[in-house]
Amino acid sequence: MTQVPPVTFQQYGPVITTSAGNPVDDNQNSVTAGPYGPAILSNFHLIDKLAHFDRERIPERVVHAKGGGAFGYFEVTHDITRFCKAKLFEKIGKRTPVFARFSTVAGESGSADTRRDPRGFALKFYTEEGNWDMVGNNTPIFFVRDAIKFPDFIHTQKRHPQTHLHDPNMVWDFFSLVPESVHQVTFLYTDRGTPDGFRHMNGYGSHTFKFINKDNEAFYVKWHFKTNQGIKNLNRQRAKELESEDPDYAVRDLFNAIAKREFPSWTFCIQVMPLKDAETYKWNVFDVTKVWPHGDYPLIPVGKLVLDRNPENYFQDVEQAAFAPAHMVPGIEPSEDRMLQGRMFSYIDTHRHRLGANYHQIPVNRPWNARGGDYSVRDGPMCVDGNKGSQLNYEPNSVDGFPKEDRNAAVSGTTTVSGTVACHPQEHPNSDFEQPGNFYRTVLSEPEREALIGNIAEHLRQARRDIQERQVKIFYKCDPEYGERVARAIGLPTAACYPAKM
């Protein structure tokens, strides 16, 4: 199957009915006792209509609540079978159907698309080995490297528990006390933090993963999706204008482009690292606050992602889409990245809360191309897939034709783990300041650095003085000019950047 089949639904008939299919004679007036009397409880159509309306909303995503999506396909253009045995990569020209969802992170479902925020970049590949979910962002790094910090970080991006307002003190207090965040903070406060819609941004898996080839050789890998529309960003003035003029700017732009057959596409590339390199590499390769410089591990092209079909119904496909980093096919495995390990639990857990135990039965989440036997996943609220009929719900058994284990799907077993069970800080002889300093000096042009300073200053100047002083010291450690320019922009003396004298 080369594309996701559209969801079938019963077309409207000529007569309005209740949810039970009974014809409705009057949809404009309730049944009452006389023309001015009270409504009658036995008016089933009224009760049916109100009761369902009361239950229309489901819990919104705790992060990535606002977004848009589309269907499409992934086509292999280059051979990477020397690295990975996953069947979706098995031959050049092979196409795999895909669903994509793009989003902001911190905003509620009604928030503006152009606010300063990372953008979610999530893909569901419907392969014959089951669904592979690539659940990333438009940034190659993240704010924290251990999932235990994630709830605290997200709380700072949401609303103050007393005022219910967004609070710059919360944001910068956390950033200034968690220096590992500075790489992502620097990226976010460039104009890359306000991309011009979803079509003009890159996507990244961010984490380190593993590829396994047919000979059971393992490699570390990172994913990159490079936009073929070209990178375009909004400056802070234009982003603010669009917040009021067109808060749904990015969702609208994606939908309209596909409707006009201007299909957006991305080139999928990978970085590959031999396992032995990780032992001596200058940075911890499992640290999601770091990148692998392309000079050390260049991009290798793999294929092309194309989005060519809008959803028929937003709630059906986009709102109910459930992505999970734990959804991997044979040949793709997790690494020891702590942030990834936490996400592998949290995403599936929140789907069960938000959509129910049988979220995997929702059409957009089904593994359409896989012929599987998930014999043990039974019952539960809203089970609507036939519940496996009369087939047994235990294994092993002696029934002919019952699904068997696939040893090809076994994990590689290439990781040796030993050590004392304890809370271990991620100690590594590297720096949280070197890469953001290099990004500031060598990646950004002077106009981009000027925009970065202005974007930071506009927000940081709203925080307390002690928080400002902590933060500019962090910027100074990345690059002295960086720290001093931010200090001047928010009205601090440049001496506030310097380490305290002993």
Curated annotation (Swiss-Prot):
A molecular function (GO) term: heme binding
Enzyme Commission numbers on file: 1.11.1.6
Disulphide bonds in the chain: none
Specify where it is mainly localized: other
Q: What reaction is this protein's catalytic activity?
A: 2 H2O2 = O2 + 2 H2O
Q: Which GO terms describe its biological process?
A: hydrogen peroxide catabolic process; response to hydrogen peroxide
Localization annotation: Peroxisome matrix
Q: What does this protein do?
A: Catalyzes the degradation of hydrogen peroxide (H(2)O(2)) generated by peroxisomal oxidases to water and oxygen, thereby protecting cells from the toxic effects of hydrogen peroxide.
Give the family this protein belongs to, as stated in its UniProt record. Belongs to the catalase family.
Q: Identify this protein by name.
A: Peroxisomal catalase
User: Can you name the source organism?
Assistant: Toxoplasma gondii
Q: What is the organism lineage in this UniProt record?
A: Eukaryota, Sar, Alveolata, Apicomplexa, Conoidasida
